[in-house]
C-alpha cells in the first residue's frame, strides 16, 4: 500500500525543489518585480503576472505543492 503514494509524494517535492533551483539559477530573469536598492525591495520569484516565466514557475510550484499535500493526506 504505501509504496506508490510515497513515490508520488517524493516526485512532487522533487519538482518543488527543482522549481526553487531553477529560480535560483535564473535569478532576476524570472523575478516578478525588479529589485530596488533605494526602496529595499527584494525580488520575488513566485508572485505577479507581468513576467510569463514568473507566472509559469508559480503555477508549477503551486500544482506540485498541492499535489504533494494531497499525497501526504493519502499516506496518513
From Swiss-Prot:
PROSITE patterns: G_PROTEIN_RECEP_F2_4. Residues 27-54 are extracellular. Disulfide bonds: none annotated. One of its GO terms (molecular function) is G protein-coupled receptor activity. It is found in: Membrane; Cell membrane; Cell surface; Apical cell membrane. Glycans are attached at residue 33. The chain crosses the membrane at residues 6-26, 55-75. The keyword Transmembrane applies. It is a multi-pass membrane protein. Belongs to the G-protein coupled receptor Fz/Smo family. Receptor for Wnt proteins. Most of frizzled receptors are coupled to the beta-catenin canonical signaling pathway, which leads to the activation of disheveled proteins, inhibition of GSK-3 kinase, nuclear accumulation of beta-catenin and activation of Wnt target genes. A second signaling pathway involving PKC and calcium fluxes has been seen for some family members, but it is not yet clear if it represents a distinct pathway or if it can be integrated in the canonical pathway, as PKC seems to be required for Wnt-mediated inactivation of GSK-3 kinase. This is Frizzled-3. It comes from Gallus gallus (Chicken). The gene is FZD3.
Amino acid at each position: 500500500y504505501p509504496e506508490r503514494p510515497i513515490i508520488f509524494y517524493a516526485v512532487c517535492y522533487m519538482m518543488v525543489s527543482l522549481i526553487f533551483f531553477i529560480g535560483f539559477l535564473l535569478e532576476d530573469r524570472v523575478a516578478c518585480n525588479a529589485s530596488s536598492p533605494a526602496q529595499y525591495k527584494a525580488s520575488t520569484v513566485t508572485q505577479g503576472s507581468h513576467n510569463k516565466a514568473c507566472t509559469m514557475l508559480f503555477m508549477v510550484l503551486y500544482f506540485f505543492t498541492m499535489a504533494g499535500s494531497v499525497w501526504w493526506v493519502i499516506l496518513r
